[in-house]
């Protein structure tokens, strides 16, 4: 085709050369070697002979060969279109120059004038032939692209393979939809399970903080304060009336060192140390009333259960200290003639710097407390001994030890307590 294009251009130049060369126009004609005639139309590579390939490899090679053929034929079509455009442009230039020459110039050589219409007509015919051949080539390329020279069995294999891939794709889409639905269901189930677990934990925490109602009796529980912090504590819901004497008894177990901390404290507005029992650092256990101090000869930091009772009366500030049913100390002048003020806050496990708060972790009680009772009188020594040896179970008439009267906070907890006899065996 390129040879035909070159012949057309050469023919136009030869015809025009019979007259005087046109001013300002120069055309260069170059010979095209025969081997260049097919340079723009490379043939597809033929498969290697004598090499045994699997059907999948032959199919893959055929597809690659088809792709390369289509790409090369597209490039050839592009080059041929460019050549046609260039030839059309030159033809237009020739027509314009010939028209101007016929109007303004004369034949100075005495030759007969040329017939421009014949030249244009011949060039048009040549161009039409080129266009016809180009359209034929494009049709052939489309035919080759749609019906390649691959063997029929390869085409069947290709079609079967494409059909199989389509079916696999549809199955995969269906599987993904099923997995999506299953994942949604599993996520919902997992979310429900998580919510149930959280609700159970929340209920358990609430039970620990507010008390467990599953005790054998309302007083068969203990408060556990396992760590020395400023946020674990118990609180007695009831408050004290104005008192002129009292007896406070409790069971406790602690192995904290140094000092067991503060088993209980009672604070009123204007006096944070209205009643406090504390063992702080290496000091002995102390009883504070209205911020006045008395040291008590009690020793309870051996990790065993001990029964403690303290009596006090405003008359002469007389006090007594009992451990495990035995009186170990007595004294007087502890806040004499001072009545215990009413309306305060009673805390288990912490010393109060303000009413109901400002706890100090170094003064916190570490251990277990139970049977915390308060009476508005001084109990007789025999009563205290009977309570300690489990022969008498007597609740406080001011503050009794009952489940619904004790709240716990900050991780403190309530647990069933050992029986009185079991506590005695632990002495």
UniProtKB/Swiss-Prot annotation:
Record-annotated disulphide pairs: 249-309
Transmembrane residue ranges: none
Residues binding Ca(2+) 1: 273, 351-353
Major site of localization recorded for this protein: cytoplasm
Tissue: Testis specific.
GO cellular component: acrosomal lumen
Residue positions binding Ca(2+) 2: 351, 353, 363
Protein localization: Cytoplasmic vesicle, Secretory vesicle, Acrosome lumen
Function text: May be involved in binding, concentrating, and sorting soluble glycoproteins or glycolipids that are destined for the acrosome.
Keywords, in A-Z order: Calcium, Cytoplasmic vesicle, Disulfide bond, Glycoprotein, Metal-binding, Signal
GO molecular function list: metal ion binding
Protein name in UniProt: Neuronal pentraxin-2
Coiled-coil spans in chain: none
Cofactor: Ca(2+)
Organism: Cavia porcellus (Guinea pig)
Taxonomic lineage from the root: Eukaryota, Metazoa, Chordata, Craniata, Vertebrata
Glycoprotein found in the keyword field: yes
Domain Pentraxin (PTX): 219-420
